[in-house]
Amino acid sequence: MSNNYHIAVLPGDGIGPEVMAQAYKILDAIRKRFNICITTSEYDVGGIAIDRHGCSLPAKTVAGCEQADAILFGSVGGPKWEHLPPAEQPERGALLPLRKHFKLFSNLRPARLYAGLEVFCPLRNDIAAKGFDILCVRELTGGIYFGQPKGREGQGKYERAFDTEVYHRFEIERIARIAFESARKRSNKVTSIDKANVLQSSVLWREVVTEIAKAYPDVEINHMYIDNATMQLIKDPSQFDVMLCSNIFGDILSDECAMITGSMGMLPSASLNEKGFGLYEPAGGSAPDIAGKGIANPIAQILSAALLLRYSLGHNDAANAIEQAVNYALEQGYRTTDLAGNGKAISTDEMGSTIARYIAEGV
């Protein structure tokens, strides 16, 4: 395993730069503790890139990302750029082209309820008390969002609209492998979500996932219909480890998983291609209303750095160290404003420094 890596850092807009500053602290602590050589280069993206370069994804940014082992992404967008045509706005003009350029076909969204944060979980107390730690693995480039034909035709009462759910065998195979490999780093359980009692695309999905599962005899596999899965997530989320989903089902379930954790400020996200190259970002937005106030929760950005170390750089030990430090900081009662309730809140900068210190101390 190489110990020399280069990361393209794209802080973006809103709270992006201030939470990214905390991720830098974490990477520095990881360098020192694990003797890993990690270098970084920073590039403009989103609204700030529009202001400086005239577009949300400059060619220099793309070229810099091509030279890196992974991308650590902040957040983009804000009211300042909402007057632009939709295709030119930061969100659509930056993230979607990056995903397409680097062929990022899989999205990984962890959702964990940390001890001490049960009060923020909207589920019943006895359910929240059990906790949960779920990884939603979503296929990003196939399915009904991209299938052809799609469109509208006709007039009057005969006007109709249509979309087409299409999945190729190779698309299902590669996302299934991501799910099973991820399960091996966790609790060795995959729940594949489909609607095989109605949809032909789901029949193929279930067949292919069942075939791929044979190569992972150490991983438990079970299948669940999407309607039942949405119910089971509310009834008992602790039953899930890795949830394997098509594009549209993953879109729905990953947001449901996010909501039951109680705070978007805790949720990282990873988008990967077949070579392990990935873009890592917080699941929340740029939060321009709190930008510059020093109150943003940096944990999602910090945990995104942990995912980067695990999935693109192959350093699961370093990723675990970050996650353990985050958990310990929360156990010790450290909270940013979004999680403080009636208690005392610490700043964005203080939270980053606290977690970095715990990494250095090896908690």
Curated annotation (Swiss-Prot):
Keyword NAD appears in the UniProt entry: yes
Subunit (UniProt): Homodimer.
GO biological process: L-leucine biosynthetic process
Taxonomic lineage from the root: Bacteria, Pseudomonadati, Pseudomonadota, Gammaproteobacteria, Enterobacterales
Protein name per Swiss-Prot or TrEMBL: 3-isopropylmalate dehydrogenase
A UniProt-annotated Pfam family: Iso_dh
Record key words, sorted: Amino-acid biosynthesis, Branched-chain amino acid biosynthesis, Cytoplasm, Leucine biosynthesis, Magnesium, Manganese, Metal-binding, NAD, Oxidoreductase
Site (Important for catalysis) residue list: 145, 195
Binding site for NAD(+): 78-91, 285-297
GO-annotated molecular function: 3-isopropylmalate dehydrogenase activity; magnesium ion binding; NAD binding
EC code(s) of this entry: 1.1.1.85
GO cellular component, one term: cytosol
InterPro entries given in the database record: IsoCit/isopropylmalate_DH_CS, IsoPropMal-DH-like_dom, Isopropylmalate_DH
Origin species: Photorhabdus laumondii subsp. laumondii (strain DSM 15139 / CIP 105565 / TT01)
